[in-house]
Amino acid sequence: MAQNPNLAALSAAGVSVWLDDLSRDRLQTGNLTELINTRSVVGVTTNPSIFQAALSKGTAYDAQVNELAARGADVDATIRTVTTDDVRNACDLLAKEYEASDGVDGRVSIEVDPRLAHDTDKTILQAIELWKIVDRPNLLIKIPATMAGLPAISAVIAEGISVNVTLIFSVERHRLVMDAYLEGLEKAKEAGHDLSKIHSVASFFVSRVDTEIDARLEKIGSDEALALRGKAGVANARLAYAAYEEVFGSDRFAKLKADGARVQRPLWASTGVKNPEYSDTLYVTELVAPNTVNTMPEKTLEAVADHGEITGNTIAGTAASSQETFDKLAAIGIDLPDVFRVLEDEGVEKFEKSWQELLDATQGQLDAAKK
């Protein structure tokens, strides 16, 4: 089967195409294999909301949940078994992509329990536990970029475990994430780990930034404010890429690179367009640059396949105009630190809520199976 030309062009421009979704249905029907073969998909990301949606639809998980119920498994153990099985199977499906890319792609992400977002020690313990349970080299453990998450990222990288840092909204936090990664690599080197085997991506959220800032611009309501709608998300991500180039062009990283260390690639997340007035491929076509990942919901993936115009690098040379966008936002009264604080709080809360819904639904299923 041939690859879609638009997505092949995106890959050729240095953007790894990952699917922001996973379910047993996708694995069992061959749908994920088809997307790998026809849509240039070379990775998969999951999150609590994705698993909650997967487990609440259809019957694909019923037999396993019933079997776990018969064995007396509690709800946490059940969810851990079910989700790690899916992730392990997806890792195996992407093993060829992992080998072919020397470990850069073919990656599948699984997130630590979102209720641990503000608990460093428990995050570290669960990250190590998930790494051991899934037991695949192409796994990435997702850890949120909260202030408690940062030292956990360093500690987990220091153990030689690959990490996807999630819920990054600001360039300032992105810099702290890159610093945490480098610190982790330095410790891993001291501990004798092979640095070339440690991989990381920094998941920078895009559309949610526009959603929050656009609402505030509409409240201000001036022509100047309204003219800035739909610009912040892309500008923010482009500034993050400039920060990435700076940090990984530094002497500090050069020393680690000499020992085989890899860059921490920026990953554009939250790339489904939420405002119908904007192009549905906006957060893909405007964020093309080498050494990046774009994880897309299937709707966005199909939109790019159908009509996404890939014209090469769309980030190079944009740092000054992107900074100008942020200067204008600040000048008309957008409180940017508050925006990023709200987005982080909402991001953690959203995942906690999905996790709780998943716990409740699974508990209901376990109870029903025991009757």
Curated annotation (Swiss-Prot):
Its EC number is 2.2.1.2. One of its GO terms (cellular component) is cytoplasm. Gene3D superfamilies: Aldolase class I. It comes from the Bacteria. The active site is at K142 (schiff-base intermediate with substrate). GO terms for molecular function: transaldolase activity. It is found in: Cytoplasm. Transaldolase is important for the balance of metabolites in the pentose-phosphate pathway. This is Transaldolase. It comes from Mycolicibacterium smegmatis (strain ATCC 700084 / mc(2)155) (Mycobacterium smegmatis).
